[in-house]
From Swiss-Prot:
Keywords annotated in UniProt: Chloroplast, Melatonin biosynthesis, Methyltransferase, Plastid, S-adenosyl-L-methionine, Transferase, Transit peptide
Name of the featured protein: O-methyltransferase 1, chloroplastic
Cysteine pairings via disulfide bonds: none
Lineage, uppermost ranks: Eukaryota, Viridiplantae, Streptophyta, Embryophyta, Tracheophyta
Disruption phenotype: Reduced plant growth and grain yield. Reduced content of chlorophyll in leaves. Reduced number and size of chloroplasts. Altered structure of chloroplasts. Reduced root length and lateral root number. Formation of hypersensitive response (HR)-like lesions. Early heading and premature leaf senescence. Accumulation of the antimicrobial compounds momilactones and phytocassanes, and constitutive expression of pathogenesis-related genes. Over-accumulation of jasmonates and elevated levels of brassinosteroid. Increased leaf lamina bending.
PANTHER family in UniProt: S-ADENOSYL-L-METHIONINE-DEPENDENT METHYLTRANSFERASE YKTD-RELATED, S-ADENOSYL-L-METHIONINE-DEPENDENT METHYLTRANSFERASES SUPERFAMILY PROTEIN
Keyword match Chloroplast: yes
Amino acid sequence: MPVLPWLAAAATTPVRRSPPLPATPRALLRLPASSFPPWSNCAKSGLPPRGPFATAADTPLGGSLPEPEEERDTLLDGALRAARFRDEESRRPDPLFIDPYAAVLLSLDVASEDKDLLALHLMPSAEHYRLVTRYIDDKLQHFISNSDDLRQIVLLTDGMDTRPYRLSWPRLSVVYDVSPRRVFITASQQLRGAGAKISRNCVVLHTSSESPDLQAGLNKNGFNGNRPSLWVLQGLPLFTFKSLEDLLLVIGNLAMKGSIFIGEVPRFTQWGAATDMASEQDRLENLFFTQGFRVSFVHYEEVAKDVGLGLDSPPEIHGRAIFIAEQLRFSDAQMESFRMHFERIEDDADEDGFEEL
């Protein structure tokens, strides 16, 4: 796979086991799919063709990506808040993207959690969320449309990512959704009840982000480290810098050389206000490089300019960063293939030498 061009230079200035779901049923706000016009930037026209519904793998539970105890009950609410952002954007006169499924995911009581979520900085502002979503949508569609080999897509999400439903996908695409299991199940049930279907061109497989061995879970679902892959990070609960390190270790082991990783790094509470953006990005760049990735960071202002918008104000996005990275290192699967190949060569040489004797 050829080396892909870099879309942005490095920025130097700001730019366990989960508890069961609540027993109380949530009221849904159903939204007809015909309420929105097609979005030409991501899909040809209308909604994606109807096809088989996403299938979830039987993955083990556990906790390779640890989360603080006090944050556990916010996962579902955080995913719902993101869905509300997408629904609100879809209703704008000139939206950056269309998500006709977001309203199906909403519950009437999600607004009561907004203040706490903002105080915890678990999500960016609505303005920045919409920009990041548009940026990721565009780049994802660009990469899969311009490569005949890029058919493994890993979405690292909050469990309510609707990209498998609302974006167009090439034939034989396999989308691996890595997210909190209980949130993913809740979203899948709601979408299924509303009649949402995934394109016939792709299949969606779920791997729990709470799996004790995320790498083994993805391999169990059929992920192939000898084939190119595209990784997308938006919404996956990462509460500490260590959790990001663990995630990058897994991706570095799985991603074939030349694979692409795009997304947004969340804010980590241990990064105090005294830490400036440049030093944070230096630390992130070193972390990516340790796992074999060459990374560039993208200013939020640049994304806004590219879509013809201006940020009303520079909100508190301290510690958040949009990135695009390329894997320069061989995956574990590639290294194993090389090892087996050289072993066969050595065995053949030994047999030839024995015959000569």
